[in-house]
Amino acid sequence: MKKLTYEERGAKFAEVLAKRFEGCVTFDDFRREIQRYNTTHVRKLNWDYGVSRIAILRADYVIKFDFAPTGWFSDGHAGNCSSEEAVYARAVADGMEHLLAKTTVLTFHGLTCSIMPRIKGVGTRYGWERTVTPKEEAWLFDNLKDLHKYNYGFRKGKICVIDYAWDAVEPVTQTSDWETSSSYESMTCETSTTWNSFSPVTDSVIFSFA
């Protein structure tokens, strides 16, 4: 039997999850359905909101659900998969697509999701600048907003930016360290994995099997 790729495995499971999430209109509905799933399955579903490098490093595959553009949740969240695709298209036009992780965007039961690629190593505080040329560095700063260590990893020795569409409409102020950018500071409060810290301003939820 042909072994499925991580995109194919992720797509099959994303369809199962999306069907379970039909009828969920609040964060509590959504959270309750995940807990219900975990009580009836041997392989527990891990989750995190926003971006999660640890999940991408350890997971068999990673599924990122974005809230539907029409406001899947009753509080009116908007999805950003279309923004991610637009940023990737701009990268292709500029010959810089190799800097970005290419996600597989799918829609099941009205819910948009993307199957995330796996990265070999998370970003380190110092070292990203040794993997890019001055032209590549300039493109990243001119086109992406959230260039902090939780948003990139390394693939084949080169930087690979993940989740690059988050509010990607304004360039950051270039500094000697991406972690000192205002976007990094604004994102650090959104990295907790506890239920009680589920942020009302996050735009996505990531699922994976450890």
Regions found by a protein language model. Give the residues of each.
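Catalytic activation segment of kinase domains across protein kinase-like and atypical kinase folds
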Residues: 145-191, 195
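Juxta-kinase regulatory segment immediately upstream of eukaryotic protein kinase catalytic domains
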Residues: 1-42
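Protein kinase-like catalytic core scaffold
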Residues: 61, 114, 160-162
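Active-site-adjacent loop/helix micro-motif of nuclease/hydrolase catalytic cores
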Residues: 70-84, 123-131, 170-172
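Conserved structural core of kinase catalytic domains
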Residues: 67-69, 89-133
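Protein kinase catalytic-loop region centered on the HRD/HxD motif
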Residues: 136-143
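Generic beta-strand structural signal
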Residues: 57-58, 107-108, 154
